[in-house]
Every structure is written in C-alpha cells, then in structure tokens.
C-alpha cells in the first residue's frame, strides 16, 4: 500500500497492464496442465484511492493496488479450487500458481465424482474496457473540504478502477474494467444527531455534491428543533427512501 494519493490520469494504462498480466498468467497455467486436465481461472483487481474524513479534515489517505486469482482444476468428473493473492512480480506469482496447481492436483484423486459438474466448452471471448472519467483525487478532496467548511463532516472516499477477467485452458479470454467513485458521509448536529448522505457515480460534479450537501444543511436545521416526546400509541410514520432501503436490506439477509 502506498501512503499518498495518486491521480487517475493513468487509468487506461493500468487497465492494459492488468489485462496483459492476467493473460500472461493464464498462458502459464496452460503449460502446467497434464493429460486431460482443464483449468478455469477468474481474476479480480483494483487500483483505488481512499480517504477518511473527520471534522471536515482528511485524517487518512492512501492508494491501494491489489490482485487475486481463483483457479478451478478439473479432471473428468472431479474438480477442486483454490486462490492466490498476486504481488505483481511475474516470477513470484508464477511460482505461487505452480504451487497451487500442484496442491489442487494432489487433492483430485481423493475427491468423488461430481455428477453436477458443468462448465462451458464453447469458447466465447469478450472485452469491455471502461472509460475513466474519474476526477483527480487531491483536487476533488480539496473541493469536498471547501464545501464542507463549518460542518461536522465525517466520511469515506473511494475512487478508482475495478478489473475482472476470466480464462480457461480451452482458449477463452474475457476482460472487464470500470471506474467509479463513492463518497459516503454524515454531518453531525450533536453527539446523537446526524444527517447521512452519499454520492457515487462515474463522473464527479462539484455542483451535484454541493446540492447534496445543501440538503444536509437543511436537514440539520430540522434536527436542531426542540425534541418532542411522543406517548405510546398508533401513528402514521413517513420513512425517507434511504431509511426504508436500510430496513429492507436488514430483512433480506
């Protein structure tokens, strides 16, 4: 993990590097197979900026690049799976994959046949490369702090690229990338009273963020009113969409 924020101007280059790296590992996996073995591999990676706000100041900031690879090894009607975290160093990562394949191969003789084993044997390769319209992270954080001046602003910022790929020993290659941001925050009126909001998307707008923050200011005014004690009874209650969404999420666990 790096300790300072990195602008997103090189996102497309990272996309190409991630894809080439994954495809290289996929080709290497093919050389490790024996006989009728088949592999399925899924790749997941991110290249993201993060920041934590407290009292309208940036308290923590960082940049994260991480990669992982899941591998299914199939022989006849038997299959087993494992995963490795990738470092980005080709020699080290190929050694990890070699060890994983050996481990998976050692499991197969001890496993029963799986009558429900099913995977596509038809090769359908695709690519979908996202276009990064993400803002420069330091400039955006400065804009957020400026707009939140005077507020008890607490929140989390995340912005960057997400990458996923699929490959198999039959020759199929699939790749997908996207670039998003998410700012989740609360504005406190007092210790037990706060307004929560969020802003997420593909392209940042200062005007849209300011509009959402002004809504928070208006709602803070409501929280500042004299509280009323409501006696027990039956009442009709209005729930904001966000509140109703949280209740539905809880009930759908």
Give the residues covered by each predicted segment.
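Active-site bordering "gate/hinge" segments
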Residues: 1-253
């Amino acid at each position: 993990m790096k300790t300072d924020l990195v602008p997103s101007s090189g996102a497309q280059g990272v996309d190409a590097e991630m894809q080439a790296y994954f495809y290289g590992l996929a080709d290497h996996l093919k050389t490790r197979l024996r006989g009728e073995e088949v592999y399925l591999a899924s790749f997941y990676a991110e290249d993201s900026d993060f920041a934590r706000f407290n009292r309208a100041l940036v308290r923590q900031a960082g940049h994260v690049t991480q990669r992982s690879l899941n591998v299914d090894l199939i022989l006849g009607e038997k299959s087993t799976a494992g995963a490795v975290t990738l470092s980005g160093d080709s020699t080290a990562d190929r050694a990890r994959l070699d060890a994983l394949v050996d481990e998976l191969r050692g499991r197969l003789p001890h496993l029963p046949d799986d009558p429900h084993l099913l995977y596509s044997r038809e090769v359908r390769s695709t690519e979908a490369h996202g276009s990064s319209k993400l803002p420069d992270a330091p400039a955006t954080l400065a804009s957020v702090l400026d707009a939140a001046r005077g507020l008890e602003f607490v929140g989390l910022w995340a912005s960057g690229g997400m990458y996923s790929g699929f490959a198999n020993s039959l020759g199929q290659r699939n790749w997908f990338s996207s670039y998003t941001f998410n700012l989740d925050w609360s504005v406190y009126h007092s210790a037990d009273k706060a307004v929560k909001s969020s802003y997420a998307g593909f392209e940042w707008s200062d005007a849209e963020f300011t509009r959402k923050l002004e809504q928070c200011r208006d709602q803070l005014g409501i929280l500042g009113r004299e509280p009323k004690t409501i006696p027990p009874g039956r009442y009709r209650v209005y729930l904001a969409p966000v509140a109703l969404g949280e209740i539905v999420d809880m009930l759908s666990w």
